[in-house]
């Protein structure tokens, strides 16, 4: 059973507080768009697909509550304006993640179309929104499984399978991933981690490697948590060990399996294939190119922004300096009522300036393929992606 980052029933929404993982499993209820804005901005929920779904469902829950308390306007246009303003507010919580903006635009269009229908009232407009938001949750899991299957097949056909000379079972692959792209970042199963899950399910995965992913440690806190939960053979490395991992194949050690592919997620893919993802992704792509390792981006089509021509047009969110200068976690070995006391530790010199971009942009030239729910997009002979074709 995979982890659930989002639990939803009609009128009720809770998220797994990812700031407390892997030490505590706590679900936070969200009752409104305002609750979701803070949860997203504080990164209690993260991952581009999950952010969009939580934002959409939070407003669905708020609309349900307003209707139940007879506080919803009977005027369809007033409800339309209310929904659009809330969606615009939600988009401001994490501007780099295109899924949220895409969902807001799509949901806003559905609401506007419903409001134009002769004879409808405000409640029917709200119902149209709620139904569309709920479909997002269902579609995301289905799309993620398709991404996993397409990606696994591509890696097995195009990656370099590990061989018996390195102590591995012939025909299996080892994959390196970055940040967290699994059930905790989506409605379920995951994108890049979904590919790893699919490889594992078919017995084709030798080992998964996950980076620590500084400064927020989504790899060590979240991806490692999912891999252990699913009993997938995995090894954690710090971010600055990736080059050594790709360069060496030491028999008899934990790092004895050669890496066949690097698979990452995305927060926004530009029309030319340039990809914004968690800081450190660009460096991994450079390392992959140098070492002849396949580099893949796994993302649903909702992450592809055809209105953004290149990565130069992507706005990169910058995070607080405390995320770099401080580390938070439980005190080792001491428990009170079954819980270990959480502490925040300073790890940098006071007064030092900090630059903390949340994302970087990987040029399309370094990407071998973009795995979507309708297949893997590869570049043509001239080295260009043609992403518009998957929307036809």
Swiss-Prot record:
Query: Which terms are listed as keywords in the entry?
Result: Amino-acid biosynthesis, Cytoplasm, Isomerase, Methionine biosynthesis, Nucleus
| InterPro entries (UniProt xref) | IF-2B-related, IF-M1Pi, IF_2B-like_C, Initiation_fac_2B_a/b/d, M1Pi_N, NagB/RpiA_transferase-like
Where it sits in the cell: the answer is: Cytoplasm; Nucleus
Residues annotated as transmembrane: none
Annotated GO biological processes are: L-methionine salvage from methylthioadenosine
Pfam families attached to this UniProt entry: IF-2B
Q: What class of enzyme is it?
A: isomerase
- Active site, per annotation: 267
Give the EC number(s) listed in the UniProt record.
Answer: 5.3.1.23
The pathway noted for it is: Amino-acid biosynthesis; L-methionine biosynthesis via salvage pathway; L-methionine from S-methyl-5-thio-alpha-D-ribose 1-phosphate: step 1/6
Catalytic activity, reaction form: 5-(methylsulfanyl)-alpha-D-ribose 1-phosphate = 5-(methylsulfanyl)-D-ribulose 1-phosphate
Molecular function (GO) terms for this protein are:
S-methyl-5-thioribose-1-phosphate isomerase activity
**Which positions does the site annotation Transition state stabilizer cover?**
179
> Its GO CC terms?
cytoplasm; nucleus
Known function: Catalyzes the interconversion of methylthioribose-1-phosphate (MTR-1-P) into methylthioribulose-1-phosphate (MTRu-1-P).
Spell out the family assignment given in the record's similarity comment: Belongs to the eIF-2B alpha/beta/delta subunits family. MtnA subfamily.
Extract the HAMAP family matched here.
Salvage_MtnA
Protein name as annotated: Methylthioribose-1-phosphate isomerase
Its lineage reads:
Eukaryota, Fungi, Dikarya, Ascomycota, Pezizomycotina
């Amino acid at each position: 059973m995979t982890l659930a980052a989002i639990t939803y029933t009609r009128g009720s929404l809770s998220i797994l507080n990812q700031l407390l993982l892997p030490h505590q499993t706590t679900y936070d209820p969200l009752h409104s768009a305002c609750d979701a804005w803070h949860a997203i901005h504080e990164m209690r929920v993260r991952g581009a697909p999950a952010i969009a779904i939580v934002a959409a469902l939070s407003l669905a829950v708020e609309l349900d509550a307003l209707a139940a308390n007879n506080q919803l306007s009977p005027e369809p246009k007033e409800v339309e304006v209310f929904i659009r303003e809330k969606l615009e507010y939600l988009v401001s919580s994490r501007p780099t993640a295109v899924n949220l903006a895409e969902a807001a635009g799509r949901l806003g269009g559905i609401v506007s179309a419903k409001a134009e229908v002769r004879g409808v009232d405000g409640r029917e407009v709200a119902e149209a929104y709620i139904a569309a938001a709920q479909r997002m949750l269902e579609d995301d899991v289905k799309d993620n499984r398709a991404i996993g299957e397409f990606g696994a097949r591509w890696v097995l056909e195009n990656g370099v399978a590990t061989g018996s000379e390195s102590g591995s079972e012939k025909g299996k692959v080892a994959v390196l991933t970055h940040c967290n792209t699994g059930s905790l970042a989506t409605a379920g199963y995951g994108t890049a981690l979904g590919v790893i899950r699919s490889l594992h399910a078919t017995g084709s995965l030798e080992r998964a490697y996950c980076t620590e992913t500084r400064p927020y440690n989504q790899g060590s806190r979240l991806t490692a948590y999912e891999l252990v939960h699913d009993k997938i053979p995995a090894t954690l490395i710090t971010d600055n060990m990736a080059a050594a991992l790709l360069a060496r194949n030491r028999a008899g050690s934990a790092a004895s399996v050669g890496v066949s592919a690097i698979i990452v997620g995305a927060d926004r893919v530009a029309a030319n294939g340039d990809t914004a993802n968690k800081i450190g992704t660009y460096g991994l792509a450079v390392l992959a190119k140098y070492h002849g390792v396949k580099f893949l981006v796994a993302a649903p089509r909702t992450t592809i922004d055809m209105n953004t021509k290149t990565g130069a047009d992507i706005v990169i969110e910058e995070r607080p300096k405390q995320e770099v200068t401080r580390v938070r976690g439980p005190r080792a070995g001491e428990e009170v009522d079954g819980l270990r006391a959480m502490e925040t530790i300073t790890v940098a010199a006071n007064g030092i300036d900090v630059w903390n971009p949340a994302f970087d942009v990987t040029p399309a030239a370094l990407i071998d393929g973009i795995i979507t729910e309708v297949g893997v997009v590869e570049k043509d002979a001239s080295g260009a992606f043609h992403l518009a074709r998957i929307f036809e």
